[in-house]
Regions:
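Low-complexity, small/basic-enriched stretches
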Residues: 2-14, 19-98
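Nucleic acid-binding interface residues in structured DNA/RNA-binding domains
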Residues: 32-43, 94-158
């Protein structure tokens, strides 16, 4: 899921290095299952490969389903059920006490940005500039463009 990124936050609860452990890159299954979730903000399509989430999009959003393989099929799986449970908690105003495992096969930079977003505490936000600052620190660079972060966030399939 893409957190809102409009205000500064306090120190993150977990580092993006810790969040990286949640992001799996190895392929477990070639079968991708999808399901629909009716959220208060609109219909969400959830995709997973049996071991991890691979996509989560509001229907009709830009890049909707861009990472879905042609053979994706509607179905049920424990991964999709776990994502539904997380969304139920989130949209009911309760802090989920777990984070579904996600498979995010992308560039190293986009994975770092995703890890930083996962470190944003529940109910808080972070600016693209702050995410860029943290990503630059992780990459050993002096600075990084907030626009590059915006591109990474926009292409995040979850």
């Amino acid at each position: 899921m893409q957190p809102r990124t409009t205000a500064r936050t306090s120190k993150p609860e977990i580092s993006s290095a810790s969040a990286e452990l949640i992001l799996k890159s190895e392929i477990i299954s070639n079968v991708i299952y999808t399901c629909k979730y009716a959220s208060p903000l609109g219909v969400i399509t959830i995709a997973g490969d049996g071991a991890a989430l691979t996509g989560l999009w509001f229907d009709g959003q830009r890049y909707f389903g861009s990472t879905l393989p042609a053979g994706a099929a509607e179905g049920r799986s424990p991964v999709l059920d776990e994502a539904r449970r997380w969304l139920d908690l989130y949209f009911s105003g309760r802090k989920p006490d777990f984070t579904p495992t996600m498979r995010y096969g992308s560039t190293p930079f986009r994975r770092i940005v995703c890890g930083i977003m996962l470190s944003i505490p529940y109910g808080q936000t972070m600016t693209y500039s702050e995410i860029a600052r943290r990503a630059a620190a992780e990459l050993g660079r002096g600075s990084m463009s907030a626009q590059a972060v915006g591109g990474a966030v926009g292409h995040n399939p979850i």
